[in-house]
Amino acid sequence: FHTDNETVWDYVNKYAEMMPYINKVKATVNGQVFSLPINLHTINQFFGVACSPDDARKLLLQKCDRTILEPQNFEQQALRFIGEELYEAFFKGYTIKQWGLHPSALPASVLKRIPVRFNYDDNYFNHKFQGIPKFGYTQMVKSIVEHENITVELCRSFAQEMRTDYDHVFFSGALDAFYSCQYGRLEYRTLDFKKILCQQDYQGCAVMNYCSIDIPYTRITEHKYFSPWEKHEASICYQEYSRECEADDIPYYPVRRADKMDLLNKYLSRAKKEKNITFIGRLGTYRYLDMDITIAEALQTADVYLTSLHEQKEMPAFTVSV
């Protein structure tokens, strides 16, 4: 878990004992293992040099395509800021597997989440507060919902007639599914996981990305490395496969494409006219959100709702910009 938001950090610490944990991701590229995000070690290892920070900056300037003044997509963004070689090695194949699209079909903003560091810092996240729940996220969520005012019903899908049972509904399901996909299905990605059992260590780290398009999975997670305070001889790993989300699959994250915005805008326009309902979360607002942002927006939404009750104002269908 990682965030710069102290309010969010305090919130999760109310429900879980957060242990110190720094996520350090490795990547297998052409038979070699590199550190991510791209840092000084990655640059020196990849190009077979021993650059200082200033030398590495100059090297990347030589590699970058500075003729691209205003990148219009992911690929152009990468070519302008890291150059063709690093883009081809670390991002092109991985991006195609993760999104099911060529990088030229994705917005440039997707790559802005991935930094390049001119030092040897291999902390994947550059956030003030970082940790992991000692007893896992399941325990944390269980602690959140164990409240006298909360009733959890499993294996029950939302139905429109349920709205009459409540003064206000907060809907975190898929936006198009709320309307039974009347205008067509929005695009999502889903994930498949293949378990690997090993009697020893499997890869020696928590996360190993596989950047080549020739390898069908995007990464392997070795779970005992997420809890280094525990001791395990054997190991459980999961290969992660990303694919298009079909109607009966669990949607993991939305794919916002510039050429599909007309369909999304139909749903957003209709949703904004709704009364007594607020759409929230990754699926409800159709945005790719990290966990800390999702929690921050949920807390903000709760505050807006309480204020609307106090001031007897109408609660909006969205409390964030969509």
Mark where each language-model region is.
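Conserved beta-strand segments of alpha/beta enzyme cores
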Residues: 17, 149-153, 276
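Structural/interface elements that position substrates and couple domains in central-metabolism enzymes
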Residues: 10, 14, 86, 203, ...
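Alpha-helical packing segments of well-folded alpha/beta enzyme cores
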Residues: 4, 8, 74, 91, ...
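Mid-domain catalytic core of redox enzymes
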Residues: 156-266, 270
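N-terminal FAD cofactor-binding segment of flavoenzymes
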Residues: 1-32
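Active-site/ligand-binding neighborhood in enzyme catalytic cores
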Residues: 27-168, 172
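Conserved beta-strand termini and adjacent loop/short-helix elements that scaffold enzyme active sites
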Residues: 21-23, 153-157, 223, 280
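C-terminal lid/capping helical subdomain adjacent to the catalytic/cofactor pocket in oxidative enzymes
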Residues: 154-155, 167, 187-198, 206-207, ...
